[in-house]
UniProtKB/Swiss-Prot annotation:
SUPFAM superfamilies in the record: Ribosomal L27 protein-like
Stated family: Belongs to the bacterial ribosomal protein bL27 family.
Lineage of producing organism: Bacteria, Pseudomonadati, Pseudomonadota, Alphaproteobacteria, Hyphomicrobiales
Residue numbers spanned by region Disordered: 1-24
GO cellular component: cytosolic large ribosomal subunit
The protein, known as: Large ribosomal subunit protein bL27
Gene Ontology molecular-function annotations: structural constituent of ribosome
HAMAP family in alphabetical order: Ribosomal_bL27
PROSITE patterns assigned: RIBOSOMAL_L27
InterPro entries, per database record: Ribosomal_bL27 (IPR001684), Ribosomal_bL27_CS (IPR018261)
GO biological process, one term: translation
Keywords for this protein: Ribonucleoprotein, Ribosomal protein
Keyword Ribonucleoprotein: yes
């Protein structure tokens, strides 16, 4: 009677789903109000002028314009939106 001993089961084989964090709109890119500029965990980037910050630290545009990243002397990177120049009518 030929028998085969039972094979062991692996305890590996799991991984969490990626959260798609990071910059969505880069420096100089045009945005409209509500556009997500970047997703992050914690404040790796800080909100500057014309941007809002969500409860999950997502930074989003409050006005139409171009995205701007600026590093201050203390090393903090601030994200802001430079408003588009309105056409004089």
């Amino acid at each position: 009677m030929a028998h085969k001993k039972a094979g062991g089961s692996s305890r590996n084989g799991r991984d969490s789903e990626s959260k798609r964090l990071g910059v969505k709109k880069f420096g100089g890119e045009a945005v409209i109000p509500g556009n997500i500029i970047l997703r992050q965990r914690g404040t790796q980037w800080h909100p500057g002028a014309n941007v809002g910050i969500g409860k999950d630290h997502t930074i989003f545009a409050l006005t139409a314009g171009n995205v701007n990243f600026r590093t201050k002397a203390n090393g903090r990177v601030f994200v802001s939106v430079a408003p588009k120049a309105e056409a004089a009518e």
